Each structure stands twice: as structure tokens, then as C-alpha cells.
Amino acid sequence: MNLPNSLTILRIFFVPLLVVVLLTQKPNWDFWGLSVHFEVWGVLILLAAAATDAADGYFARKRSEITTLGILLDPIADKLLISAAFISLVAMGLVPAWMVVIIIGREFIVMGLRNIASAEGLVIPASPLGKTKLFLQVLAGCIVIYSARHVGIKLLALVLLWLVVISAVVSAVHYFLVFWSQVDDRFKQHQRAPLVLEQKKNPQDVPTP
């Protein structure tokens, strides 16, 4: 297995570890008088998982190791990580459930649109909005996790959560518009095709001079 795919699988392994740390709120260790509580471990795990997302794409392009397995696993790993993190935060009472429904619902809507497009031979390109959304999700996740024992940053956490929700909605609308535009173009092409064939079968008589 190549390096990019190994990093993607590592990201998947981070998911249950993050969930256990958040839901058990452990470990809470003291190192030579320095307390390192569960929220620090949660942030570190989420950042490490996000780092593998950036690294696998970089190495796949750098080493020309883009594979079908990697194309399949990478978005699945991202969705597992974000879904598990935010569902755990709902269970901890740190994030409203309706926000997470929108965040995760967006992921499945876009995935569905991509699958339909792929089945029809269409391609929905990655959007800068999608990349911004993922960055905001990781940032908001880290701040919300850290706010579990640091109430002074709860307002910042709420602001970031709203930005995540807004970016999720905007990017979902963008993907739908791109999808609809491509479907509409395909439909118009199918409508024009019989006319073109009919013209070829029955060419107009060209008058001779």
C-alpha cells in the first residue's frame, strides 16, 4: 500500500480514538505539574487527523500515486471524521443537534449529487467553497472541544459553528447549481441530437447556379 493511502487509513483509525476521548472525557494526565486534560488530547487528535488529509493529497500528487482506492477512501475518511467529531460534541452538550444535522446532511447531499453525476458520466469539480468548509469544520471542532473546560472561548466557538453551518449551506447550494447546470446541458444536447440526425438524413437541396 502506498503512502497516501496509508495516511488516509490512519485518518480512519483516528476516528474511534477521538470518539472515545470525547465521550469518556479521558485521559486527564499530569506531567511534572503540568495538567493535560482530555480536551487537549481531543484537539491534538483532530489536528493530527486533519494533517493526514492534507498530507495524503500532497504525496499523492507529488509522487504520482493517485489510485482508485485513494479516490474512494479519502472522502469517506473525511466524512467519518467530521461526522464522528460533531456527533460526539452533540452528545457532550457542546453543539446544538440541529446544526450537526445541517453539517452532516450537507455531506450526504453532495455525495448523492456526485454519485448521480458520476452515473450519468458527469463530473462535479471540487469547489474552493468545499475546501473552506472543511477548514472551518476542523477549526470549529478544535475550538468547541477546547471550550469544554474553558468557557471563555464559548462565544468564539459559537461564531465558528455558525460559519460552518453557513458555509455548509452555501457550498451545498453551489454544488447543486453546478449539478443542475450540467444536467440541463445534457438534456439540451439530447434534444438537439434528433434534429441534427434529421438534417443529416434529409439535407436541404442546394440550388445550382
Each model region followed by its residue ranges:
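Alpha-helical transmembrane bundles and membrane-interface segments of multipass inner-membrane proteins
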Residues: 1-209
